[in-house]
C-alpha cells in the first residue's frame, strides 16, 4: 500500500546551522504518528517542510512524498491544490489562522462553500460542527472575542471540515483544560477512520492517548522512535525519561514566601458578556509578593479577570480598590498568545531596546536573564515569526521582568512549553518575581501545577 506521507532523510538548515538532523518515516492510512519534544526542537519546522511552506532563509534536503508523488516533482500550484482537500493543517497559533474580521461561524461555513462546494448545507453542517465542540452559542463571535481554548477549537473545525485524508495537527490541545483536551483528542482519533494523523506536541498525555508511533526529538535530533506504548512505558533515552518525569504530579511544592501590604482588594465583582455571566460575587485581596493562581475551564473568564486586575476593563458590578497607585509600566501582563503581542516587523533585539529606552532599564540585565531563561543570544537577531512558540514565550517573560514590575499577570505562561521547560520556566518566574517583591497572578487550566506553586488558588 502506498504511504500517504513518506519522509526520506529530511534535514532542515539555515546558511549557518542545521536545525533538524536527517530523519525518515512513513505514514499510511489509519495510522497515527506523534512528534514529541521540547520547544525549539524543530517539530513545527518539520511540518512546514512537509506542507512546502518553510520560512524564508531556511532550506531542506532529502525527499518528501505525498500520496505517492514527490513534492519536488509538483509545481507550486499543484502543491497548493492539495491544501485543504487532501492535506489539512491545524496550526499552532489559532488566532493567526483565523480571519480577525470574520465571525467564527462564517469561517467554518466558508470551508463548506468554497473548498467543498456545498452551499446549500453549509449552515446546517456548521451548526452541527460547533455543537460537536460545545461552541454552538459562539458562532457569532469574532476571533478576538474568543478565549485561547475556544479559538483553538474553531481552528480545529476549519481544518477538519473537508475530511482530508492527511491531517497535520501542530500542538492541537495547547491552552485547553483537561475536558476540552480529551474532547479534541477524541476528534483527532476519528481522523484515523478516514486517513492518517501527524501530531506535533510536547504533551506526554496527548501522545499516550493518540497511540500509534512516537518520534521523540530534541534540538533537531531524534532521541527515540517506536510504538507509543513501548516508548512511554520503557523509555530508553535519558531525555525521554526526563520528559515523562517532568509531569506536574512530580513537582516539589514551592516554599511559600512572606507577603507584604495589600496591593489591591477585589470587592464583590461580577462580569457579564451580553447575557452570559462569566463570574459574580468575587472577593479577595492580593498582597505584594503574593502568588495567586486562577484556574478554570477554557472560556470561563480567567483572562477577563486578569484584565480587570490590571485596570484594562471595568467590572459589571462591584469594585477593585488599589490602596496605593501602581506606577505606569509597573503593572504588566504576559499574554497567552505571545506571537500576537509582539511586533513582527522588527528584531527581538529592537523590542528589548525599546523597553530599555522607554523604562530606563539597564541593558546589563539582559545577558543574565537570557542565560536564566535558557535563551541563546543569537535569537535576538531574529524577528518574532522566526523563532519557536516556546522560545517566544520565554522572550516575553524576559521582556516583562526587565522592568521589575510591581504586579505581573501571567496568562498561561507555560502553555507553549514542554514539561521540562515548563517546570523550570515557571519556577524561574516565581524566583525572579519573589526577588523583587512583585505580586504574581498565574492563570492556568492546570490546577495541579498551580497548587504546587501558589499561595492560593482561585477556581472559576
Give the label of every model feature segment.
Residues 129-144, 369-385:
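Conserved ABC nucleotide-binding domain
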Residues 84, 162, 403:
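Conserved signature/switch motifs of ABC ATPase nucleotide-binding domains
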Residues 132-134, 230-265, 453-460:
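C-terminal boundary and immediately downstream tail of ABC-type ATPase nucleotide-binding domains
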Amino acid at each position: 500500500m502506498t504511504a500517504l506521507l513518506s519522509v526520506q532523510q529530511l534535514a532542515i538548515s539555515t546558511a549557518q546551522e542545521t536545525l533538524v538532523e536527517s530523519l525518515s518515516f512513513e505514514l499510511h492510512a489509519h495510522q497515527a504518528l506523534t512528534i514529541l519534544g521540547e520547544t525549539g526542537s524543530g517539530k513545527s519546522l518539520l511540518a512546514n517542510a512537509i506542507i512546502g511552506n518553510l520560512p524564508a532563509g531556511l532550506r531542506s534536503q532529502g525527499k518528501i512524498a505525498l500520496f505517492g508523488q514527490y513534492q519536488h516533482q509538483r509545481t507550486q500550484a499543484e502543491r497548493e491544490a492539495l491544501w485543504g482537500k487532501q492535506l489539512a493543517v491545524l496550526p499552532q497559533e489559532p488566532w493567526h489562522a483565523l480571519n480577525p474580521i470574520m465571525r467564527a461561524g462564517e469561517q467554518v461555513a466558508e470551508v463548506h462553500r468554497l473548498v467543498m462546494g456545498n452551499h446549500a448545507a453549509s449552515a446546517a453542517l456548521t451548526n452541527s460542527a460547533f455543537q460537536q465542540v460545545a461552541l454552538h452559542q459562539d458562532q457569532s463571535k469574532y476571533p478576538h472575542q474568543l478565549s485561547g481554548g475556544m479559538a483553538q477549537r474553531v481552528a480545529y473545525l476549519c481544518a477538519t471540515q473537508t475530511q482530508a485524508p492527511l491531517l497535520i495537527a501542530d500542538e492541537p490541545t495547547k491552552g485547553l483544560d483537561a475536558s476540552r483536551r480529551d474532547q479534541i483528542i477524541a476528534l483527532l482519533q476519528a481522523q484515523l477512520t478516514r486517513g492518517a494523523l501527524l501530531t506535533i506536541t510536547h504533551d506526554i498525555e496527548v501522545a499516550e492517548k493518540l497511540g500509534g508511533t512516537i518520534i521523540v526529538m530534541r534540538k533537531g535530533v531524534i532521541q527515540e522512535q517506536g510504538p507509543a506504548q513501548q516508548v512511554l512505558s520503557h523509555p530508553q533515552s535519558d531525555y525521554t525519561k526526563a520528559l515523562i518525569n517532568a509531569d506536574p504530579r512530580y513537582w516539589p511544592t514551592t516554599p511559600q514566601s512572606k507577603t507584604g501590604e495589600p496591593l489591591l482588594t477585589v470587592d464583590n465583582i461580577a462580569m457579564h458578556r451580553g447575557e452570559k455571566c462569566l463570574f459574580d460575587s468575587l472577593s479577595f485581596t492580593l498582597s505584594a509578593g503574593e502568588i495567586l493562581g486562577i484556574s478554570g475551564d477554557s472560556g470561563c473568564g480567567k483572562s477577563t479577570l486578569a484584565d480587570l486586575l490590571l485596570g484594562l476593563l471595568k467590572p459589571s458590578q462591584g469594585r477593585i480598590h488599589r490602596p496605593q497607585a501602581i506606577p505606569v509600566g509597573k503593572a504588566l501582563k504576559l499574554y497567552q498568545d505571545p506571537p500576537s503581542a509582539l511586533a513582527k516587523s522588527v528584531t527581538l533585539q529592537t523590542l528589548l531596546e525599546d523597553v530599555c529606552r522607554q523604562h530606563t532599564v539597564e541593558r546589563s540585565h539582559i545577558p543574565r536573564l537570557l542565560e536564566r531563561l535558557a535563551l541563546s543570544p543569537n535569537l535576538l537577531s531574529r524577528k518574532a515569526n522566526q523563532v519557536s512558540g516556546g522560545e517566544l514565550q520565554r522572550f516575553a517573560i524576559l521582556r516583562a521582568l526587565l522592568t521589575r514590575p510591581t504586579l505581573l499577570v501571567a496568562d498561561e505562561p507555560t502553555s507553549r512549553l514542554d514539561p521540562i521547560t515548563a517546570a523550570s520556566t515557571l519556577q524561574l518566574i516565581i524566583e525572579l518575581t519573589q526577588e523583587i517583591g512583585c505580586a504574581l497572578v498565574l492563570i492556568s487550566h492546570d490546577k495541579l501545577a498551580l497548587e504546587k506553586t501558589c499561595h492560593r488558588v482561585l477556581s472559576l
